[in-house]
């Protein structure tokens, strides 16, 4: 059975996230809504995706991030067959850095 992601509750959560104004507000919000391990797992996946885009090996990624090869494989599958969400994030971060 496939879970439906597009729900009113998820929309409401995303609206709250989109309303955050700066990094400090993000820390405040995410420290309340996520456990430390959940937040660290999300950030680990993002770092893994960045390193995969930089053509790092699974061994290099595992050593630097502590991610399992299963996690690295899942992130790699998302990069190759997903909705391009990671790339959208990377592009926007890059644009923000270019403007500074």
Task: Cite the ranges covered by each PLM segment.
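Short alpha-helical "recognition helix" segments of helix-turn-helix
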Residues: 60-65, 72
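Short, Lys/Arg-enriched anionic-surface-contact patches
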Residues: 25-44
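Active-site anion-handling motifs in enzyme catalytic cores
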Residues: 17-21, 27, 100
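General nucleic-acid-binding
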Residues: 1-20
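Residues at alpha-helix boundaries and the short loops/turns that link adjacent helices
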Residues: 20-24, 36, 55
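Short, amphipathic alpha-helical "recognition" segments used to contact nucleic acids or chromatin
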Residues: 42-56
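C-terminal structural segments of small proteins and small subunits
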Residues: 69-96
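Long, compositionally biased
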Residues: 53-60, 92-100
């Amino acid at each position: 059975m496939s879970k439906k992601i597009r729900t009113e509750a998820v929309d409401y959560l995303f609206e709250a996230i989109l309303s955050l104004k700066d990094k400090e507000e993000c820390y405040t919000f995410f420290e309340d809504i996520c456990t430390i391990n959940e937040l660290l797992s999300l950030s680990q996946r993002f770092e893994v995706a960045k390193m995969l885009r930089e053509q790092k090996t699974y061994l290099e990624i595992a050593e630097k991030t502590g991610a399992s090869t299963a996690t690295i494989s899942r992130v790699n599958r998302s990069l190759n067959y997903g909705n391009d969400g990671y790339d959208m994030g990377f592009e926007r971060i890059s644009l923000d850095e270019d403007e500074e």
